[in-house]
Amino acid sequence: MNVPTDPLMRLADRDQEHDCEGYGPGKVCVRIAAVAELPTRAGHFRIVSFYNNRDAKEHVAMIRGNIVGAGDVATRLHSECLTGDALGSLRCDCRDQLLEGLKLISTMERGILLYLRQEGRGIGLINKIRAYALQDRGLDTVEANLALGFRDDERDYAVAAHMLKSLDVQSVRLITNNPNKIRALTGYGVTVSSRISHVIPPNEHNRFYLETKAKRSGHYIDYSGKPHLTEQSDAILIDGMPAPDDVIDNGELGRNDQPGAGVPMSRLTLK
């Protein structure tokens, strides 16, 4: 039998008979289904599809360079947004987040974008449209979710963590403004070595949405609109975020009552 020399194809072959006991509290099992080349407007990638036993959804990874066995891999978790990604909605910044994330990764030696089928922060497309209708009547994005009986964010990252494990990624530099993603991945055993900020300038339709994410959901967003894609290695202070006396101490992210509290971050200091 010919053994593939390509690292991704070796993983795919290995996963044809993959049958693990599950990963994390939910016993999530993920395996690679297929690998192909995918040229895009943002650059050339390889696309990897996955099976999983958690939600029966077909999540994919967009991969740049050789990430198998690598550490400090620039990684973006992008949740599906039909209205933004495909239809160009201006109510959110999802399409810009997706495209700019791919462009950023395409400039690097290696990187990953996980495209997760978690429409509407996990509440699904129909409920997202219902939430939009409530926002049309004056509620913000958090209030709309709560009014429908959901939490602010219903997403779960167990599958994403196992996707990274299946790709044999040793540690990630997470491209995110969301401290909950850092906390979730860390909780599932993923080593997050640092954060790369990913702020998109707002438009007149999504400015309030982005302000709400910063003020109410704890996202690290400077919603003044300045483009910002640099890696955060120095202490930062963002309007609406915890004050200077809330700076990380002893390797913990924020105070115990702040989103992301207690996340071990070996090389990151945030306010």
Feature names for model-found ranges:
Residues 1-271:
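Catalytic domains of riboflavin
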